[in-house]
Regions:
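C-terminal motif of bacterial Sec signal peptides marking the signal peptidase cleavage site
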Residues: 16-19
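Repeated scaffold domains used in trafficking and secretory/extracellular systems
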Residues: 65-69, 107-113, 152-159, 196-205, ...
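Beta-strand-rich domains and repeat architectures in extracellular enzymes and scaffolds
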Residues: 55-85
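Short loop/turn segments that connect beta-strands within beta-propeller blades
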Residues: 91-95, 133-137, 180-184, 239-244, ...
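Blade-level signature of beta-propeller repeat domains, shared across WD40, Kelch, NHL, RCC1
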Residues: 313-353
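Short coil/turn segments that connect the beta-strands within blades of beta-propeller domains
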Residues: 74-75, 116-118, 163-164, 222-224, ...
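Conserved beta-strand positions in repeat-built beta-propeller and related beta-rich domains
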Residues: 79-84, 121-127, 168-172, 227-231, ...
Length: 353
């Protein structure tokens, strides 16, 4: 019996020793991350106009409203109210009326432009450009009231300004008068020293084909001054530095386009993009273009565009200004505002293996 036990114990020890010399195999289960083909999603934007809002005579206390031009500085909207003989100032976001400014009955406003602390008003038949303090509405002085033809502005139909210069579009004399802001004395009743006259040859307004009752636009874009003649599709531009250095002899770039006729242009939050109101193939459109498009006069491929449809009616001679994805338009006896909205679509594109 004892011998059997000893033999069993010896056998177990030998088995244990043998097992230590063998390789042990185990199946181990663990989480593994395996690369899989991933689909990509293509987003196609679909921008449209909605959220319509208007302002009429009732919103300015029952006074006459004839909005012929406008300008937004991002905080306030300045509206040239020709019938009301004033500039009406609205909150740019809410379009609530804040104040009005005028120089008696002489503010026959055809255009308005804000630059720095001042507001410049092209006063049409008053044959002058009026200067106001932008925040208070205080009248300060006027430009272009001297003797004809040296400094008198025969018809102040349009105005634009940079930190250095003021540009006045004189349709009767078919030129643009330029005033040097550094030489303007805001304490004087009149400032009549003309810095330069930019000739426009026979293309410019003043003929029977360009009625002075219509609204026109000028804008400083990039390094140049642009002036638009919508009936003929003519665009003038001058390098601002050329105007400063060469004055009357500053060369103009003149182009004409019979199918794409810009009436007005507005800066946006992006200094490389602009919104225009234009007639394209006989229909009114609001369209967004890049600075490069404008410089090249390439209006065939806007980044965004909106035309009249069953919901949206665009005035035929509208001036447009951009305000934080909203477009504000002149429309005769009222202001129109449309919000730009987006309803994107998504296209799944499987990745190629």
């Amino acid at each position: 019996m004892r011998k059997d036990v000893m033999m069993i114990s010896a056998g177990l020890m030998m088995m244990a020793m043998a097992s230590c010399n063998q390789t042990e195999y185990r199946e181990i289960t663990e989480d593994r991350v395996v690369s899989q083909p991933v689909d990509t999603i293509k987003v196609a934007d679909h921008f449209y106009l909605d959220g319509y809002l208007s302002r009429t005579s009732e919103d300015i206390g029952g006074r006459q409203l004839n909005a012929v031009n406008l300008f937004s500085d991002g905080e306030e909207l300045y509206v040239a109210n020709f019938a009301g003989k004033c500039i009406d100032v609205f909150d740019a976001e809410t379009l609530g009326l804040k104040r009005s400014m005028s120089n008696g009955d002489r503010t026959l406003a055809r255009d308005v432009y804000a630059e720095g602390d001042h507001l410049f008003v092209a006063a049409g038949d008053s044959r002058e450009v009026q200067i106001f303090k932008k925040k208070t509405g205080k009248y300060l002085s006027r430009l272009g009231t001297g003797s004809w033809p040296a400094s008198n502005v025969s018809w102040a139909g349009c105005v634009c300004a940079t930190p250095r210069l003021v540009f006045v579009r004189d349709s009767k004399e078919t030129n643009i008068r330029v005033f040097d802001r550094n030489a303007i004395n805001l304490g004087a009743a009149n400032n009549n020293n003309v810095y330069a006259k930019l000739a426009t040859d026979s293309y410019f307004i003043g003929s029977k084909f360009e009625p002075q009752s219509e609204s026109y636009d000028m804008e400083a874009i990039g390094d140049s001054l642009y002036s638009f003649i919508p009936r003929t599709g003519t665009i003038y531009s001058w390098k601002v530095q050329d105007i400063i250095e060469k004055k009357n002899d500053a060369p103009a770039k003149i182009t004409q386009n019979a199918t794409e006729k810009i009436r007005s242009i507005s800066k946006t939050d992006d200094k490389e993009k602009f919104f225009v109101s234009m007639e394209k193939d006989g229909k009114m459109q609001l369209a967004e273009y890049t600075l490069a498009d404008i410089q090249k006069r390439n209006f065939s491929q806007p980044t965004r565009s909106f035309a009249s449809d069953s919901r949206v009616s665009l005035p035929s001679q509208t001036i447009v200004t951009y305000q934080k994805e909203k477009l504000i338009l002149t429309n005769g006896t009222k202001l129109d505002r449309w919000e730009i909205r987006n309803n994107p679509s998504y296209e799944i594109q499987p990745r190629k293996k």
